[in-house]
Amino acid sequence: MSQLVYFSSSSENTQRFIERLGLPAVRIPLNERKQIQVDEPYILIVPSYGGGGTAGAVPRQVIRFLNDEHNRALLRGVIASGNRNFGEAYGRAGDVIARKCGVPWLYRFELMGTQSDIENVRKGVTEFWQRQPQNA
């Protein structure tokens, strides 16, 4: 199975979700000057920012990570977290990234997710990778 790449703000909600998920994952650093580069296909897990609008929904660190053509080429899907208080903008970062990068928006969860979210994502990620061609 390929990996997960995620970003978590200082609130650590996404970090806690990843820890509970128990799957291999690499974190995009909070420090914008530090960068990572991935070497295999991955699913991105990202929080949504901005209080509900499209502008600012995707964290700057994630934009910078995806602006690296190598990283963007290996993206296979996106999972977004958000806050239901934002209404239609709940999980908007997932929609923005999926549309701009041409990958499926696989799932969204609120804040640090529920146990049901953990189970759904774990199962969904496993099934997603099983459906992918070996060299995709």
Swiss-Prot record:
GO terms of molecular function: FMN binding
Top-level taxon in the UniProt lineage: Bacteria
One Pfam family recorded for the sequence: Flavodoxin_NdrI
One Gene Ontology biological process: protein modification process
Family matches, as SUPFAM superfamilies: Flavoproteins
Signal peptide: none
HAMAP family cross-referenced by the UniProt entry: NrdI
Known function: Probably involved in ribonucleotide reductase function.
NCBIfam families xref list: nrdI
Family: Belongs to the NrdI family.
Protein name: Protein NrdI
Originating species: Shigella dysenteriae serotype 1 (strain Sd197)
Species classification: Bacteria, Pseudomonadati, Pseudomonadota, Gammaproteobacteria, Enterobacterales
